[in-house]
Structures are given as C-alpha cells and as structure tokens.
Amino acid sequence: EVRDFLRHLADERQLSRHTVTAYELDLRQLTEFLTEYLGHGDWRWTDKEVDRLALRGFMGWLGRRGLSRRTVGRKLSATRSFFRFLHGEDRIASNPAGAVRAPKTAKTLPGHLTRGDASDVFTEAEKRAEQNTLAAARDLVILELLYGSGLRLSELYDLDLDAIDRGSKLVRVMGKGRKERIVPVSEA
C-alpha cells in the first residue's frame, strides 16, 4: 500500500523524486513506530488499532526523539496524505489521521536593526540619493516610510500617492484586517 501511494505521488501528482523520498522516509518511521506500538509486525493499515490515538502516539514518539515541532508537523502532513489516499482508494473505512491536530509551532519574532545599523543604512541611502537618481531617491523615501513611520511592507506595497497628505504630513494606509490607519510622515 505504501508502494502504491509513492507511485501515486510520483506518477499522478508528479511530485519531485526528493519529495517522494521524504514521504517514503516519513512512512517508514510510521511503520517502525506502529510495529513497536502494536507489539508485533504483522499488523495492517486496515487494523482498528491503527487509529487516531496511535497516530498521536507517533507524534509523541517523534518528539521524544528530539525532532522539532515543525518536523513533526511535516511528518503528520505526510501521514495525513497517505491515509487520505488509502481512504480515497476504499482501502480503509475512515481516515484516522484526519482528526489528529498538528503541533503548534513557536512563532519567531522578526529580527530588528540596532540603532547603529539603522544609522548606517540611512547614511548609505542618503549618499546614494545625493547622486540625484530617481531610484536612489525612491529608496530613501521607502526607508523613511518603513522606519520613520512604522509602515509594514504590505502597507507600503499597497500605498497610493493620493493617500499622502503633504500639507499635514500624514499618510492613510490600509493595515491588517483591511483597517485604515493614519500615520505621520517624518520631515525627510
């Protein structure tokens, strides 16, 4: 059944050889775990013991082996695809992986520039802007809006010229959740 699934990935879904190999390794680990978990090697994918609890156990087993939550989540994704395939082919009555939730991954905060790094970036941008090229002036304005006004990249990308009020030095931007906000523009 695993061979059929891997052939399906390669031939029908046309996934790369590396991706198919990754799925194969993930399912080999699942097979190893289930043999250990069930206490014997003559189990079948259709056995009722191959259930949601067994798959949750697999995730815990992977975690105890030192794998990151992200890696465990990826292996769960491969497992879900495999069981979805088996269910779609009517080889199992229900998909036990469908009800297994992926582990929450830690959200890393974006890095930031030190004050000195920011100063260096602006100094370089100002030097380039003095060369009177349109691109250099544009880049300086972009930096000023991002850093000085606290715009997000998505807000800057969606910004229209008519959203800038030069008289009051304010910019109207569409923020997260399509909420409009007004931010000040610095002197530069």
Task: Enumerate the predicted regions with their spans.
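Conserved catalytic core of the tyrosine transesterase superfamily
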Residues: 1-188
